[in-house]
C-alpha cells in the first residue's frame, strides 16, 4: 500500500466530512451535543468520560450505525486492537499466538460479567446486545479471570418491564440473508422473560472454488436465547439465561478465509509445506494454482468444513441490595464441540499416482500414492465458573469491591493430517518387528491429541477513594492460583522414501519397502525403533506406548501470583479527567500439548508491568478527546516456536519460548458534533512493540537463515542450519499505526430521519511470527464502509443499507510461509479479510 494512496484516502475522507458539515445548517434540526455513554468497566455504572482507564464502548445502536456485526468489525474500529481469524484477539500487542491446548488467552472476554473461553460470543447479533466495551491494559482486580492485555465486555439485553419486541431481516450479496427476533416483557408482577433467535445464511462462499468441491466461507448459523428474571422480594433480583449456538460453515474457526498464493510444489518428492511424512500430492502435477492470480479463487476436490455443535451457554446471576452494599453471585457454564477440516493439498488432483525417485539404494517407483490429503482439527470444551463479589453502592467518597472466584475447564483437542484411500497407511507395520501395528483406519500420517483440566482460584479487591472534589486514588490487589493437569499424545505413520531407506537398513528390499507404511512414532520422537529408546532419554522417560498406537505422556503444573493496580485521578472540573495508573498483569504458564511431543513443552507464566497516563476532556458537550500514553514491560512473553524433532524424517513440533518485550504507545480517540445533525469521529493508535531478549533459535521455514530479514548469529550448526536472534522483531498481531476516521450526517424529515455515514480505516502491516522475515508480514491495508439509515418518527421502523469494504481491497489478516520447496520457493498461506459486501437490513419494533 503506497503512501500516495493512503494520503489520497485521508484527503477524500476529509473533503467528504467537510462537505457534509457545510451542508448541514439547512437540513438538520437536532442539537449539537454528544450523547453521554454509561459503562460498567469498573463494575459500576459510570460515564465513559469519568472512568480512569482506556475504554472504547459501543451501544447496540452505535454498532448498527457503524455496521459492527463481528469481532473483526470491533477490532477494525477500535484503537490498539487486532484480530486474526483464528479466534485470537490482541490488544496493545498482547495476544494469544496459538490455540494449542494448555495455553490461556491474553485478552479476557466477559458476557454479562461471566468469563468465556471463546471469542465466538462477540459475534452475537447486536439485537441481543446492550453494550460492548473494550478495556485496554491489564485487568484483574475487578474481574474473575486474569488478562494481561485487556478485556472485552459484552453486556446483553435483560428482560424488559413492559412488553416489547423486535424483528430484523437482512439480505445481501453472496446469497446472504439473516433473520433475528427478540420478544421481552412481564409474565406476572415481579417475573419477566426474554426469548429470541437468529438464523444467518451465506449460501455462496467468498472464495470461489472452480473445482468439483464447494466454495469456501459459506455460512449456516443458528442461535437461540431465553432468559427469565425474578424479583425475590424488594431487594433481590435473580436471572437465568440460556443460549444455544449452532454453526455449519464451509470454513474454519474464527472466520478463516484461507488461500495458498504460491505455485504448487511439483518437484519435491515428499513433504507438503514443511511436512515430510508422506509423499507430496502435487509432485509432477501439471495444474496451475488459481490463487496466485486471485486469492479468492481455489481449485480443490474437497470442501472445507467448520461445524460448531452442542454449543450451550448457561448463566445465572443474583443481585442482593443490602443497603450500603450489593452482594452478587455469578455462575456460568459453557460447552461446545467444534470440528473443522479441509483440503490440505489445495489441489484438484484425484486418483492415485506413482512417483519415480532415486534413493541411496537405487531407483524405485513409489506406487499407488493418494493425492487426497486433509487437515482436521477439533475442540471439545466445557468450562464453568463461580464468583461472589460484594461492592459498595453508596454515593460516599469511598467505593470498593471485593470478590472470590473459581474456574474449571475441561478440554480435548485432537488434530492432524490424513490421506484418504491409501490401504498401506491404514494398515501400518511395527518399525521394530515388521509385524502389523495397530490399525490406522483414518489414514492419519500425523495425529496429535491432548486433554486438559484446569482449576483456577482467585481473591480480588479494589478501592477508590475521593480525597476531595478534584483528587481520588485507586488501589487494587489480586491473588491467583492455577492448577493444570493433562495428557499429550502423538502418532506418526510414514509412507515416504525415508520409510524405504530405513527399512532397507533392516534388509527389506526397496521394491518391497516402497509399498509399505510404518508406525514411526518412536523413531520420529525419540530416534529409535522401540519405547526403550525413549526411556533412555531423560526428556522422554514419562512417555508410554498406547495400545491403539502412538505415545502419550502426562503433564501437570501449578502457578500462582499476586498482582494489583495503583492509580491517581484528577478532575479539576466536570469536563476533565486526568489519570495516572500502574497495573501488573499475569497470565498463567502452561504447555503446548497436541503439538508433537516436543521435549520441552512447558512455558513459564507471563507478567506485564503497565504504566499509563491518560486525559479525557469534553468541550461544551460537543467535542470529546480521550488520550492515553502507555509503557509496558512484558516479561515471559509466551511464543510458540516450531522445532525439528528428527533430522532424518524432517518431522517438526512446537515448543514454547519465554521472551522479553517492551511495548509503548499512544492512543487518541475523538468525537465532534460541530453542527446540528453532524458527528465526526476518529481514532489513532501508535504502538512500538519489540522483542528485547530472545536468542538463539532456528527458523524451520528458513533453516539456513538465507531469506530476507533473517538475523543469523554464530557459526552454522553441524547440519548447516543457522541460529537467529529475535531481538528487534516486532510482536505479532501489532500494527505500528492504525487510523480510524468517520462521520455521520442526519437529515430530519416529518416522517422520520435519514443518516448517512462513512468510515475509513488504515491498518499498518503486521507480523505473524516472531522472526523478522517479510515472509511473515501481512501488508498494510485500507478499508472504507458506507451506510445509510432511515428511521421513522415513532422509532418503530429502521432500514439500513450498507457497503462494507467498498473499494473491494484484498487484505490479509495473517501470512505464514513454509520451508523452501523443491522449486526454490515456499508455500505462502494467507488468511483473507472479507471482500466487498452489500446488503439491506430491515428492523421493526413493537
List each model region and its residues.
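Outer-membrane beta-barrel translocator/receptor signature
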Residues: 105-106, 118, 127-136, 141-224, ...
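Structural signature of Gram-negative outer-membrane beta-barrels, strongest in the C-terminal barrel
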Residues: 229-231, 390-393, 405-407, 450-633, ...
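C-terminal beta-signal and adjacent terminal beta-strands/loops
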Residues: 677, 761-769, 790-846
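Gram-negative outer-membrane beta-barrel transporters
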Residues: 470-473, 631-633, 656-770, 841-845
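Membrane-embedded beta-barrel scaffold of Gram-negative outer-membrane proteins
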Residues: 317-322, 326-332, 337-342, 571-587, ...
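Solvent-exposed loop segments that connect transmembrane elements
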Residues: 206-215, 252-300, 344-374, 416-449, ...
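Outer-membrane beta-barrel domain signature, strongest for Gram-negative TonB-dependent receptors
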Residues: 213, 219-401, 407-409, 624-626
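Acidic, small-polar-rich N-terminal luminal/periplasmic segments of exported/outer-membrane proteins
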Residues: 33-162, 613
Amino acid at each position: 500500500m503506497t503512501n500516495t494512496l493512503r494520503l489520497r484516502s485521508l484527503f477524500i475522507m476529509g473533503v467528504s466530512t467537510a462537505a457534509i458539515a457545510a451542508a448541514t445548517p439547512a437540513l438538520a434540526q437536532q442539537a449539537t451535543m454528544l450523547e453521554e455513554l454509561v459503562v460498567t468497566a469498573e463494575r459500576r455504572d459510570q460515564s465513559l468520560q469519568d472512568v480512569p482507564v482506556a475504554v472504547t464502548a459501543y451501544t447496540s445502536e452505535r454498532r448498527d450505525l457503524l455496521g459492527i456485526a463481528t469481532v473483526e468489525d470491533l477490532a477494525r474500529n477500535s484503537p490498539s486492537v487486532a484480530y486474526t481469524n483464528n479466534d485470537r484477539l490482541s490488544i496493545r500487542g498482547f495476544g494469544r499466538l496459538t490455540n494449542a491446548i494448555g495455553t490461556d488467552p491474553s485478552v479476557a472476554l466477559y458476557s454479562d460479567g461471566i468469563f468465556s473461553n471463546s471469542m465466538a460470543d462477540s459475534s452475537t447479533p447486536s439485537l441481543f446486545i446492550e453494550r460492548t466495551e473494550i478495556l485496554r491494559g491489564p485487568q484483574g482486580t475487578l474481574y474473575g479471570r486474569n488478562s494481561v492485555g485487556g478485556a472485552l465486555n459484552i453486556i446483553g439485553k435483560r428482560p424488559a418491564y413492559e412488553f416489547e419486541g423486535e424483528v430484523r431481516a437482512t439480505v445481501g450479496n453472496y446469497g446472504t440473508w439473516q433473520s433475528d427476533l427478540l420478544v421481552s416483557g412481564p409474565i406476572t408482577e415481579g417475573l419477566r422473560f426474554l426469548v429470541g433467535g437468529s438464523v444467518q445464511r451465506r449460501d455462496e462462499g467468498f472464495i470461489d472454488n472452480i473445482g468439483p468441491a464447494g466454495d469456501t466461507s459459506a455460512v449456516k448459523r443458528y442461535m437461540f436465547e431465553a432468559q427469565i428474571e425474578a424479583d425475590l422480594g424488594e431487594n433481590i433480583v435473580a436471572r437465568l439465561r440460556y443460549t444455544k449456538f449452532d454453526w455449519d460453515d464451509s470454513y474454519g474457526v474464527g472466520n478463516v478465509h484461507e488461500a495458498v498464493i504460491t505455485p504448487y510444489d511439483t518437484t519435491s518428492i515428499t513433504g507438503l509445506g514443511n511436512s515430510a511424512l508422506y509423499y507430496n500430492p502435487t509432485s509432477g502435477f501439471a495444474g496451475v494454482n488459481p490463487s496466485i492470480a486471485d486469492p479468492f479463487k481455489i481449485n480443490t476436490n474437497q470442501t472445507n468444513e467448520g461445524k460448531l455443535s452442542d454449543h450451550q451457554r448457561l448463566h445465572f446471576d443474583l443481585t442482593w441490595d443490602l443497603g450500603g452494599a450489593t452482594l452478587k453471585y455469578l455462575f456460568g457454564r459453557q460447552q461446545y464441540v467444534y470440528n473443522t477440516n479441509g483440503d490440505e493439498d489445495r489441489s484438484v488432483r484425484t486418483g492415485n499416482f506413482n512417483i519415480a525417485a532415486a534413493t541411496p539404494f537405487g531407483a524405485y517407483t513409489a506406487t499407488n500414492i493418494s493425492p487426497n490429503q486433509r487437515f482436521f482439527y477439533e475442540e471439545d470444551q466445557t468450562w464453568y465458573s463461580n464468583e461472589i463479589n460484594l461492592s459498595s453502592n453508596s454515593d460516599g467518597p469511598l467505593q470498593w469491591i471485593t470478590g472470590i472466584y473459581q474456574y474449571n475447564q475441561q478440554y480435548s483437542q485432537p488434530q492432524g493430517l490424513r490421506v484418504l484411500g491409501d490401504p498401506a497407511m491404514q494398515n501400518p507395520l511395527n518399525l521394530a518387528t515388521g509385524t502389523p501395528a495397530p490399525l490406522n483406519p483414518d489414514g492419519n500420517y500425523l495425529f496429535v491429541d491432548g486433554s486438559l483440566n484446569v482449576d483456577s482460584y482467585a481473591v480480588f479487591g479494589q478501592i477508590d477513594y475521593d480525597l476531595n472534589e478534584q483528587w481520588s486514588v485507586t488501589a487494587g490487589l489480586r491473588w491467583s492460583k492455577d492448577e493444570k493437569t493433562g495428557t499429550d499424545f502423538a502418532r506418526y505413520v510414514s509412507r515416504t522414501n525415508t520409510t524405504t531407506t530405513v527399512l532397507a537398513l533392516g534388509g527389506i528390499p526397496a521394491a518391497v519397502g516402497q509399498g509399505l507404511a510404518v508406525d514411526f512414532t518412536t523413531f520420529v520422537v525419540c530416534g529409535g525403533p522401540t519405547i526403550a529408546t525413549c526411556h533412555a532419554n531423560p526428556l522422554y522417560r514419562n512417555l508410554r506406548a498406547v495400545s491403539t498406537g502412538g505415545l502419550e505422556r502426562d503433564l501437570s503444573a501449578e502457578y500462582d501470583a499476586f498482582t494489583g493496580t495503583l492509580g491517581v485521578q484528577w478532575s479539576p472540573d466536570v469536563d476533565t479527567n486526568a489519570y495516572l495508573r500502574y497495573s501488573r498483569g499475569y497470565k498463567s504458564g502452561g504447555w503446548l500439548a497436541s503439538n508433537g511431543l516436543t521435549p520441552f513443552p512447558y512455558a513459564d507464566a507471563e507478567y506485564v508491568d503497565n504504566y499509563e497516563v491518560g486525559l479525557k476532556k469534553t468541550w461544551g458537550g460537543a467535542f470529546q478527546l480521550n488520550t492515553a500514553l502507555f509503557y509496558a514491560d512484558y516479561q515471559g512473553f509466551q511464543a510458540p516456536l516450531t522445532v525439528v524433532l528428527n533430522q532424518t524424517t524432517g518431522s517438526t513440533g512446537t515448543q514454547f519460548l519465554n521472551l522479553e518485550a517492551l511495548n509503548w504507545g499512544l492512543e487518541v480517540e475523538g468525537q465532534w458534533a460541530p453542527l446540528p445533525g453532524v458527528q465526526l469521529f476518529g481514532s489513532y493508535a501508535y504502538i512500538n512493540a519489540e522483542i528485547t531478549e530472545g536468542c538463539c533459535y532456528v527458523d524451520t521455514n528458513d533453516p539456513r537463515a538465507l531469506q530476507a530479514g533473517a538475523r543469523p548469529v554464530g557459526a552454522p550448526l553441524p547440519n548447516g542450519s543457522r541460529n537467529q536472534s529475535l531481538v528487534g522483531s516486532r510482536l505479532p498481531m501489532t500494527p505500528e499505526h492504525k487510523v480510524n476516521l468517520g462521520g455521520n450526517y442526519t437529515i430530519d424529515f416529518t416522517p422520520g430521519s435519514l443518516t448517512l455515514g462513512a468510515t475509513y480505516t488504515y491498518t499498518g502491516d503486521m507480523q505473524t511470527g516472531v522472526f523478522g522475515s517479510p515472509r511473515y508480514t501481512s501488508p498494510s491495508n485500507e478499508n472504507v464502509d458506507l451506510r445509510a439509515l432511515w428511521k421513522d418518527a415513532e422509532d418503530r421502523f429502521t432500514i439500513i443499507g450498507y457497503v462494507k469494504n467498498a473499494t473491494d481491497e484484498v487484505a490479509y489478516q495473517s501470512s505464514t510461509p513454509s520451508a523452501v520447496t523443491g522449486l526454490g520457493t515456499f508455500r505462502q498461506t494467507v488468511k483473507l479479510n472479507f471482500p466487498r459486501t452489500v446488503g439491506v437490513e430491515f428492523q421493526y419494533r413493537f
